[in-house]
């Protein structure tokens, strides 16, 4: 049987490889087991039903003395950088491909001039073009680790983003860093103080050549229902009936675009803006005099969820370091078996036709 293989110097495509496999199997139907056994074992295994072909004996011990060299590394398969013929499904651009929640200690500046090291969860992703199979995700981690010893700011995050855009040859990219930021808070009357922890995320987005710096903050506060407060006072005034208004732990997720004007928006600045908007922040260290003061503070600042969104909005509007923003508030009702929620958006950055079905479920903060 004469088999002509013109063009072997060319790289065969998938159809040509399938045709070659069909030829091999046609030959195997008339070949003897001895002839097949003379084939390279990796080729012989492509022939169905040939029990005489034995799988090569493999070592089951870890080769601790194996030495890796550049030549061997060159032979390692790299499926993610393979040809577009390996793509499964539709050849479509993917907006975000990457890794989520890899953790490491990161050093951050504080407004007082010191540094603080915090356990940080990092998510990094890039866009993937329609004709590319995939990305080498470890490159995102490696690029980030090159900057891990620096004290982080948005400028350092930009350098890390540049590194993995170049490494992965992508157009769009994103880094998000989540951590819990401690800030000492004074009690209302007792003179005690303790650390309040704030969930913060920094996000740098590069899309279509436009970069945006975004800061997210979860602010936890007590909300006393204004309607319930008035009804309680009505019962006392008209019937001499003791009644208490309902209040509940509430959470606002504040997301702001940080303007590129050279002025730093410190974590502490955004936290204090939230306190000015809604002063009934949950307390850390509490004695009896603090508990009484907190009851008085709530009575002086009753608030519906609509009020909360607009009060936060007022503070964000007044800060020139802040561009677009979004406020998501959730009052986790003690009267109702459901929550009261509101979403307020300013500008194009956070606008969306749809909300994540689990969005409000992420606003629960347990003690």
Curated annotation (Swiss-Prot):
User: What is this protein's record name?
Assistant: GTP cyclohydrolase FolE2
> What residues correspond to the site May be catalytically important?
225
Q: Which family does it belong to?
A: Belongs to the GTP cyclohydrolase IV family.
Against InterPro entries, the record matches this protein to:
GTP_cyclohydrolase_FolE2, GTP_cyclohydrolase_FolE2/MptA
Question: What task does this protein carry out?
Answer: Converts GTP to 7,8-dihydroneopterin triphosphate.
The record's top EC class is hydrolase
Molecular functions per Gene Ontology: GTP cyclohydrolase I activity
Which UniProt keywords are present, listed alphabetically?
Hydrolase
The record's EC number reads 3.5.4.16
Quote the Gene3D superfamilies the UniProt record gives: Urate Oxidase
Q: In which pathway does it act?
A: Cofactor biosynthesis; 7,8-dihydroneopterin triphosphate biosynthesis; 7,8-dihydroneopterin triphosphate from GTP: step 1/1
GO biological process entries: tetrahydrofolate biosynthetic process
User: Which chemical reaction does it catalyze?
Assistant: GTP + H2O = 7,8-dihydroneopterin 3'-triphosphate + formate + H(+)
Q: Which domain of life is it from?
A: Bacteria
Report the source organism: Roseobacter denitrificans (strain ATCC 33942 / OCh 114) (Erythrobacter sp. (strain OCh 114))
